[in-house]
Each structure stands twice: as structure tokens, then as C-alpha cells.
Amino acid sequence: MLPTSSPQIHRNGSLSERDAARHTAGAKRYKYLRRLLHFRQMDFEFAVWQMLYLFTSPQKVYRNFHYRKQTKDQWARDDPAFLVLLSIWLCVSTVGFGLVLDMGFVETLTLLLWVVFIDCIGVGLLISTLMWFVTNKYLMKHPNRDYDVEWGYAFDVHLNAFYPLLVILHFLQLFFINHVVVISSDWFLGYFVGNTMWLIAIGYYVYITFLGYSALPFLKNTVVLLYPFALLGLLYVLSISLGWNFTKGLCWFYKHRVQ
């Protein structure tokens, strides 16, 4: 979607006072939160397109972030449609976990509140803030006030990376819970299937996070964001060798937190 107007730029390259005020973090945050109350203004079709391409070609998703920067002078999303759809996915999959684990209504509701407000929002805010600090502090090519990683963009990168992880671990894995956790939890096939799904899910998270920050032209050495793959591979080999079952641990954790 093309904007109806573009920011006015002075000859010295700075925004006019009116446009600068409009592009402050507070103004962007207010506009984003306001649109949460107006579903008709959200582009859900485009959000679905992004969700599909996060699995098949995540680079295309970040090309759109480049386009938004050129047309709207911000890297972060200004449309909360993606967040709304992600929240729906999270709620539906959590209810599915409650059903598969034979939880009652109150237990499922408690699990849903934990997953939404702690696992998704709380952990998401923590990771986004950490990445925002690290990238601005250590990965800037030329630190200055004109170029910085927006906190909203760091949060968007987290949401992008979190979505495939959510689908794999909270949706697709539901179809294997009985075999991975109940029937074959201590068998090689059980923890091999479960741990492989964890490997793929976390691998997606690391890779999409790397793509998000490598898309910013003013950052350097973003390849360091791929280093967790080494630890991930080591943990996977150890888990298979020692018979650790991550999915069984997740189910135990979910049941324990609602008791």
C-alpha cells in the first residue's frame, strides 16, 4: 500500500519539526496501539502473506520492511494485524495443548494466561529489549543519532522468528504428543522425533532473527547472530545420545505450572 504523503526533508537532510514529532517513538507507538482497536484498518491478507513467506522465503518479508522504511520512514510495522493473528494462533494452539493433556477448563484457561502474558509477551519484551540494546551498542557500523535500531523493529523481528517456532512446537507437535510423550517417551523414536522438531523450530528462530538484523544496512558483523547454531547442534546431539525428551519436559512444565 502506497502512502498518500511523504515526510518533508530539509536541505540538511533532517525532517521538519512537524514530521519529526510525527515520527517519534511515542507517536509511532500511539498510532500502533490505536489501530489495535480498529480491525477494519488492519491488513490481515498481507499479514497472512507474511506468515506464509516466513516459512518459505523469509527474505521477502524483510524486503517489505525496506519498502516501509522508504515510504513511511520507519522499519517497524505500523499495522498490528500480524500480532493479532499471532495471538489467535497462540490461543488456539494452547487450548489444543490443554485438550491433549486432559486439562480441565480452569487449568486450560490458566495455561492460556501463562503462555500469552509470560511466554509470549513477557519473554518477547525481554528478548526484544536485549537485542535492541546489543545491536545498538555493539553492531552499529557508525554509531550516531541518525541511525539506530528501532525497539519496535526488534520486537517485530522477534515476532517474525517466534511464529514458525509457535507453529512447529505448539501446533504440528500436537499430532505427535501421544507418541512422543506417552507411548514412546523413553524410546529412541520418541525423543528423536520430538527433539528434531525442537531443532527445526529453534533453528528457524535463530535464522529469521539473523535475517532481520542483517537486513539493516547500518549494522555490521550480524553473522555473530548465527553462532547459536553451534550450541543448538551440540545440544541436539547430546539430547539424542543421552535420551533427553524436550517435548516430555514441556508437557510436564505445562502441567506443573497450572497445578
From Swiss-Prot:
It is a multi-pass membrane protein. One of its GO terms (molecular function) is RNA binding. One of its GO terms (cellular component) is Golgi membrane. GO terms for biological process: protein localization to cell surface. The chain crosses the membrane at residues 81-101, 111-131, 163-183, 199-219, 223-243. Belongs to the unc-50 family. Its main location: nucleus. It comes from Danio rerio. The keyword Transmembrane helix applies. This is Protein unc-50 homolog. Residues 1-22 are annotated as: Disordered. Residues 1-15 have a biased composition (Polar residues). The keyword Membrane applies. Keywords: Golgi apparatus, Membrane, Nucleus, RNA-binding, Transmembrane, Transmembrane helix. Involved in the cell surface expression of neuronal nicotinic receptors. Binds RNA. The gene is unc50. Residues 1-80, 132-162, 220-222 are cytoplasmic. It is found in: Nucleus inner membrane; Golgi apparatus membrane.
